[in-house]
Every structure is written in structure tokens, then in C-alpha cells.
């Protein structure tokens, strides 16, 4: 119910993020420039945030937390990426992929650090995310 005012405006500004780690990170450079040129935060500039896979993290950080681009850049640090994409020796050497590509332990810890125990319904603006494992 709290998002019905989204539909009262004639035009909606939607920001959609692609999946894939590199695409999720590259878009941040464009968004930083957009913030500088518009003198408004990305959170203020859009009505709805959408993301797939790694792009869903960006959408959630903006829509749920009202994060700034600097916060997203902190999420995508090299150290965090190493922890998110951690693979066991068996996963690295196996010719068959019988399990998820990456362990979820590091991912869960990092996501908890940025989102605590928030639920998507607690977002500050509407967010749509798609993902699969």
C-alpha cells in the first residue's frame, strides 16, 4: 500500500541494473557522474530501482538504504569481491558443476553488514529484484 503514490505520477523514473559483477560495478562510474552533473543523489533522482543478480545488490542498496554511490563502491571493494566469490578447491577443479558456483558464506556475511536484517518491504523506495542460484 505504501507504494501506491508511485502510480499517481504521470512519469516514473526507473533505474535498472544488469546482472554480472563487472556490469554492476561499471554502472557506478556513470551514476557518480550523473550525481555530479545533476547535483542530486541517485536515490532522489529515481522513483523505482530494479536489478538482476549482482545488479540487484545495487538496486537494494539504493532503494532500501537510500545509499550514496560511495556506499555502493564500498560494497564492491576487491576484498568483498574475494569473499563473495570464494570457491573451494573441489569447486575450482571439478569438471562438473553440481553446486552453486560460489559459496554463500562470505556473501551472507557481507550482505548482513550492509543490510542488517532488513526485509525488502522495509525499503525506502520501491525495489524489484530478480536472481537465481
For each predicted feature, which ranges?
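Patatin-like phospholipase
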Residues: 3, 7-16, 21-112
Amino acid at each position: 500500500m505504501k507504494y501506491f503514490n508511485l502510480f499517481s505520477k504521470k512519469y516514473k523514473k526507473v533505474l535498472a541494473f544488469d546482472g554480472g559483477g563487472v556490469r554492476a560495478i561499471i554502472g557506478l562510474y556513470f551514476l557518480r557522474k550523473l550525481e555530479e552533473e545533476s547535483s542530486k543523489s541517485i536515490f532522489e533522482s529515481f522513483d523505482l530501482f530494479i536489478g538482476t543478480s549482482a545488479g540487484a545488490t545495487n538496486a537494494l542498496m539504493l532503494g532500501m538504504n537510500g545509499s550514496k554511490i560511495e556506499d555502493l563502491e564500498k560494497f564492491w571493494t576487491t576484498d568483498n569481491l574475494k569473499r563473495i566469490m570464494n570457491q573451494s578447491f573441489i569447486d575450482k577443479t571439478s569438471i562438473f558443476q553440481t553446486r552453486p558456483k560460489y559459496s554463500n558464506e562470505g556473501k551472507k556475511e557481507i550482505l548482513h553488514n550492509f543490510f542488517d536484517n532488513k526485509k525488502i518491504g522495509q525499503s525506502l523506495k520501491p525495489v524489484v529484484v530478480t536472481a537465481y542460484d
